[in-house]
Amino acid sequence: MRITIDIKKSVQENAAFYYERSKRSRKKIDGAKSALQKTEKEIEKLERTKQYEEKIQESKKQRKKEWYEKFHWFYSSDNFLCIGGKDQTTNDIVVKKYMEDNDIVFHTEAPGSPFFIIKTEGKNVPEQTIKETAQATASFSKAWTQGITTTEVYNINPDQVKIELGLPKGTFMIHGKRNYLTPVLELAIGIYEDKAMCAPLSCIKTHCKHFLTIKQGFTKKSDAAKKIKKFLEEKYSTKIELDEVMQVLPAGDIKIN
């Protein structure tokens, strides 16, 4: 740096002049650094936004729905597929079309229940999966809308389910011994392989990184679904249809925990 001395000024005055000048230069440099850092942060923010939007666009692409998504469904913590009817028609389909000899069938003791089945594929089913399916059967039954917090659920073998003439669609006669459980009505919801999955909490903890627990409450299902949708989209950086969330939730009002 070249310095010019003003001979009309004292040494102290010359020094003060260059000191003030250097301070102004430092402020300019500091300002430039601050502007650069701010610009870099803005660029990073834009990049993150771009990546997020790209993920959203990717998730918007129409995915092929699995056959079981027309029913209540979940994968147990032991990775067994469990499906249940949503109404008389789908109960009828679950039993007549998808129930196989080695499956385990569930229903509540009270009327107004889905027929749930564990698709065993001939494998031994752990007690945990049986408990989870019983809880799902209870939670997706009319007991939820009636405000009942626990209800009896039985499980049976497929050969105990009899189709008899004169019974309404989705209704079957049950013969023989029933194995009973009395689960609490409670579920959770998360994303499993790009699909909204609503199931007992133990299943969701096993398969989903982020989730919400739900119980019977006083929030309208449609309003709760909007909150759940927002949570899932933010946590999983994905796009999910509101109708998909609505379809997997139990009927009736909800409390989100």
Regions found by a protein language model. Give the residues of each.
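Extended, highly charged segments
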Residues: 1-257
